[in-house]
């Protein structure tokens, strides 16, 4: 004997989602939360720009739950540039994105601390490069960042 089952509206919606799944990651907006460029020895320091500056970069990732499945992910950059033992520049940037996530709970942390930073990094790098150039400094290209290694190091640090 055949049995017929009638699907509830909720089951039909869920079945429809299998054919038309929601994207796992949706970036709602990206924005500059904080941006600061200081050139303490300007304009005299520009005469000393005969060689590439020594640049130190510190990068951090932070994620906060906003509500439901919405999160704010921030990349924080602190950069110091020195030339001939003088401070050339100090740049700080916090670049953020508001994202909606449709991922299983066990994948949430890696997505927030690895995948979203990978997505927004090129935009943050562009802001930094443009800021330095507009500040009268030579362009500086930040190499890609290994967010997987950062995540693993973060997990090991108590």
Q: Language-model features: where?
A:
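N-terminal intrinsically disordered, cationic/polar leader segments
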Residues: 5-119, 123-158
